[in-house]
């Protein structure tokens, strides 16, 4: 289940993408339009900046804009940055693999086989859905 933090990050980034991405968008505008708590949004945007997804600009014309084109930022990039690995169990994680303590044999574990399929299908959908798709409501059914 996505955390509120991820949902807010997605909403903020989709909003920024919809503005065209040229001029920085003030945090006050993002917070007001998306009805997000400003202080929480500041923390989220700092994480997104540190993760290379947005750039920040100070001053009167300051705010946030995407660090790269919307078509090059996937839903998967955002969720991994905020949540961590997509895998539901550590033994199928690509980036945070850890053997399950209660597993006798990974190669024959039926739970692992199902979780691999879940991970692969989830990653395929999220990694192939960009902010450009979401900002234009072009998500495939």
Where are these regions (language model features)?
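A short alpha-helical element within helix-turn-helix/winged-helix DNA-binding domains
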Residues: 28-34
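Key DNA-contact positions within bacterial/archaeal DNA-binding proteins
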Residues: 39
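Non-DNA-binding regulatory cores of transcription-related proteins
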Residues: 67-141
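Basic amphipathic alpha-helical segments that dock to polyanions
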Residues: 44-49
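Short amphipathic alpha-helical interface segments
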Residues: 9-21
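Beta-hairpin "wing" of winged helix-turn-helix
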Residues: 52-67
């Amino acid at each position: 289940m996505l955390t509120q933090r991820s949902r807010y990050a997605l909403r903020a980034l989709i909003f920024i993408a919809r503005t065209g991405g040229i001029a920085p968008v003030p945090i006050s505008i993002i917070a007001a339009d998306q009805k997000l708590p400003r202080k929480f949004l500041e923390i989220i945007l700092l994480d997104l900046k540190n993760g290379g997804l947005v750039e920040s600009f100070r001053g009167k014309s300051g705010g946030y804009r995407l660090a790269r084109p919307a078509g090059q930022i996937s839903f998967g990039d955002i969720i991994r940055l905020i949540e961590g690995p997509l895998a539901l169990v550590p033994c199928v994680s690509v980036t945070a693999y850890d053997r399950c303590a209660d597993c006798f044999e990974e190669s024959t574990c039926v739970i692992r086989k199902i979780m691999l399929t879940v991970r692969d299908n989830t990653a395929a959908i999220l990694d192939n859905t960009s902010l450009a798709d979401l900002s234009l409501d072009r998500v495939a059914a």
